[in-house]
């Protein structure tokens, strides 16, 4: 079964149930969806073993924000087991003070529920929180939640309406800590 990039781009920042719904609608068959997801999971799990790399500037940015007294939490559409495994592999999991994952919410990104829950768990109002995102769905989620959104696009460029809702769009995580501090 073929799957094109445009379809894959719809998955970015989405929870597994949302991805499965998108696939069901696209293929019109839950059996095909299950087969596509099973193959995707095999490929992804193999890639994680051999190709998982930390995004340049991520560790430095987190360390700088922690040193400056910021609370650093994680809000990811991934399942907790996946996020924990991947972040432990790159030495970052223990740096996050709170973790909110896809299975913690009913509605995944672009719905604001994930960021609203992450803010609540951290003990801050959304307008006190900075969200760092690399996808359209994540940015929309953070913007709609009322957070300050800092975008560092990764795979797909952000549409202008999303860019307009962000505090700033950066080319690299190396510039992120300074941008966050400038808003404080």
Could you describe each region identified by the protein language model?
Residues 63-66, 79-184:
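Asp-based, Mg2+/Mn2+-dependent phosphohydrolase catalytic module
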Residues 16, 54, 111:
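Conserved donor sugar-nucleotide recognition element shared by glycan-biosynthetic enzymes
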Residues 49-53, 77, 146-147:
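Short, flexible loop segments at the rims of nucleotide/cofactor-binding pockets, characterized by
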Residues 15-30, 86, 118-119:
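Helix-loop "lid/cap" segments that line or gate small-molecule binding pockets
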Residues 73-74, 151:
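Hydrophobic beta-strand core positions in alpha/beta domains
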Residues 11, 75-77, 132:
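Structural motif
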Residues 2-3, 7, 22-60, 68-70:
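Metal-dependent phosphoesterase signature
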Residues 12-16, 36-44, 79:
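Hydrophobic/aromatic residues within well-ordered alpha-helical segments
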């Amino acid at each position: 079964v073929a799957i094109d990039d445009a379809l894959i781009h719809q998955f970015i920042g989405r929870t597994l149930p949302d991805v499965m719904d998108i696939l069901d609608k696209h293929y019109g068959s839950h059996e095909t969806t299950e087969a596509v997801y099973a193959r995707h999971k095999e490929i992804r799990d193999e890639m994680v073993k051999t190709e998982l790399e930390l995004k340049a500037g991520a560790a430095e940015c987190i360390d700088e924000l922690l040193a400056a007294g910021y609370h650093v939490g994680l809000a990811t559409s991934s399942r907790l087991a996946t996020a924990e495994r991947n972040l432990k592999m790159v030495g970052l999991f223990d740096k996050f003070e709170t973790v909110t994952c896809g299975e913690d919410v009913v509605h995944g990104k672009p719905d604001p529920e994930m960021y609203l829950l992450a803010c609540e768990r951290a003990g801050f109002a959304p307008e006190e929180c900075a969200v760092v995102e690399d996808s359209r769905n994540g940015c929309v989620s953070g913007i709609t939640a009322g957070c300050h959104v800092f975008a560092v696009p990764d795979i797909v460029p952000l549409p202008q309406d999303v860019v307009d809702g962000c505090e700033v769009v950066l080319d690299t995580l190396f510039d992120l800590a300074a941008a966050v501090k400038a808003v404080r």
